[in-house]
Amino acid sequence: QLPDAPVTVSPRVGFNWVVLGYQKGVLRGCTGYFIGRLPFVWLVSGVSNSGCGQYQYSYIQADAKSLPTFGEISKFYPTVAEQLSDSGLSLPKEPNAAPQTPTIIDKDLKMNATWKSSLAVDVKLPYDINFSVEGIYSRDFNPSVVTTQNYYWDGKKTITLSPEDTRHYLTCSNKSVTPYLITNAGHKAHYESLTFSLAKKFDFGLDISASYTMAQAKSYGDGIGDQVTSAYTNNRYSVNANNDKEIGFANYVAPNRLLITASYSKDYAKHFGTMVGLVYEGTNFGYDPYAATRFSYTFAGNVVNDYKGSNNLLYVPASREALDEWNFSDYTYTDAKKQKQTYTAEQQKDDFWNYINQDSYLKGRKGKYAERG
């Protein structure tokens, strides 16, 4: 069952205030509430993976001298008895198995929405240089997420990994079937950015500009995945379980971006002109499974039983002594000289603690959980 299609409204308002005289200084801003949409391929999954049996009707008439008309074959049989009584019915030898990953759509599912606001100042500097600074803030409402229905927390069962790290432990009602639910999350996801830019236009046809943007965003998930199964797992690292709809840093926003452009234009022969331009973009950003800008510190295996992936965020110990409560064990291996060596539990604890101290992020998260990157 698909959700209803109500009328939606996206109101917005903006202003442009000249504060320093014509073409010298402008204060501008706007705010609005915008209705978006979720990936429609997720909704399609609710139909194609509905959990109901589906079959194809094939009309076969081998002795026909001409193709049958549409009216002769476009018969719809609403009951099984009518389908079986059709002489042209072709049934498969083996019945189709029911989908193992049916998709359920929340009956109250709402389209994604964003409240977005911006405030900027444009100033004319000496030597006819245009300077702008702009801040943008947005907050998401009803972002769409995917959860599972056969893995759930009963409100009691927990797992203690260390005295400071106790988490929910999920129960699986049926391991042979994994139904997914498309639903809405909360209102904590947000985005903010600040941009500084300079631009200069010369009389002889040269235009140059430079801008720098710092930004960050937190989301319930990146919304990636052409299937609900991948939307449930991709960049959904969490402390307790993916079903808890925890927020973390979005992986699709460049934290820092420098953009420099230069172009030269020349008119000639009254009706012709040529422009040559150069663009430089520098950013610590890459959205690729093997080269993402951000990453998450997680356990090598799943510890809360929400699925088989390594999606549980690491707890960063507050002290070296706290590692004595962790489950380390001696590791024996054969080195390059074919000699057996032992990597003791104490050595592993020391190395792990040294790694935490040399990393600026982990060092600042002592006694806390790592954040989703």
Language model feature labels by segment:
Residues P39-V41, G221-D222, P289-A291:
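A short acidic (Asp/Glu
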Residues S87-L91, M275-G373:
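Extracytoplasmic gating/loop element in the C-terminal half of outer-membrane beta-barrel translocons
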Residues V7-V9, A113-W115, H190-E192, A254-L258, ...:
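Residues that define the transmembrane beta-barrel architecture of outer-membrane proteins
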Residues S132-G273, G277-G286:
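Gram-negative outer-membrane beta-barrel transporters
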Residues V47-N49, Y152-W153, T229-S230, T293-Y297:
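Juxtamembrane/interface motifs at transmembrane-helix termini
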Residues Q1-N184, V303-L314:
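Solvent-exposed loop/turn elements at secondary-structure boundaries
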Residues Q1, P99-I105, K175-T183, V239-E246, ...:
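Extracytoplasmic loops and strand-loop junctions of Gram-negative outer membrane beta-barrel proteins
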